[in-house]
């Protein structure tokens, strides 16, 4: 019985001694609100003016892949991917996401297509 009490006493003393650790917790940095990013705002504006929502949503597959899947696939790629993907938006095509062809958007400027791509890439999972 004395051994059990002694064991509890030692365990209590050891747990009370916290060492030199700070008692304040460091909070993890908060994830930035992407809706405040100018690239997000411009992308939403351009998406509304074009036919993107006919085939895409942020999270659900329609005719085309969800924007979040696109963002996750290209996360970590160099910035040069923006111009490449924008040219794919303008020219259309198939093969990357299956055999259903994305319609060309030849009336879209390279700058606007790049703005839409930047918006999409912001939607990646954190």
Where are the predicted features?
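Positively charged n-region of N-terminal signal peptides that target proteins for export
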Residues: 1-4
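Sec-exported extracytoplasmic/periplasmic mature domains
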Residues: 48, 72-75, 79, 90-94, ...
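Axial heme c-ligation environment in periplasmic c-type cytochrome domains
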Residues: 65-71, 90-117
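Electrostatic cytochrome c docking/interface patches
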Residues: 24-47
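Gly/Gly-Pro-rich "capping" loops immediately C-terminal to redox-active cysteine motifs
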Residues: 57-88
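Bacterial signal peptide processing site
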Residues: 17-21
